């Protein structure tokens, strides 16, 4: 199962050339986390992927914390859009 990276970027970008903003990074990480979660449900003993999942969750958590501290409105919109707890 491949991630539609361009579609995710287009849905989260702030302007036409935006590919690295916090919103885009969190959106990409969220899709990767969902994909890894599905993979780990089928492959319970894949500890390397589990470690990668934890790293991605940790990075997303740091980025969301940064966004919440610097732009609360953008944080709330992103959490609502991605259906994340917040």
UniProtKB/Swiss-Prot annotation:
GO terms for molecular function: rRNA binding; structural constituent of ribosome. One of the primary rRNA binding proteins, it binds directly to 16S rRNA where it helps nucleate assembly of the platform of the 30S subunit by binding and bridging several RNA helices of the 16S rRNA. InterPro entries: Ribosomal_uS15, Ribosomal_uS15_bac-type, uS15_NS1_RNA-bd_sf. HAMAP family: Ribosomal_uS15_B. Part of the 30S ribosomal subunit. Forms a bridge to the 50S subunit in the 70S ribosome, contacting the 23S rRNA. Signal peptide: none annotated. Keywords: Ribonucleoprotein, Ribosomal protein, RNA-binding, rRNA-binding. This is Small ribosomal subunit protein uS15. The gene is rpsO. Belongs to the universal ribosomal protein uS15 family.
């Amino acid at each position: 199962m491949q991630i539609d990276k361009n579609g995710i970027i287009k849905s989260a970008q702030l302007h036409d050339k935006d590919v690295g903003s916090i919103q885009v990074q969190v959106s990409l990480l969220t899709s990767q986390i969902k994909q890894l979660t599905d993979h780990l449900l089928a492959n319970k003993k894949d500890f390397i992927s589990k470690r990668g999942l934890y790293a991605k969750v940790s990075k997303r958590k740091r980025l969301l914390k940064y966004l919440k501290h610097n732009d609360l409105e953008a944080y709330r919109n992103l959490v609502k859009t991605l259906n994340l707890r917040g």
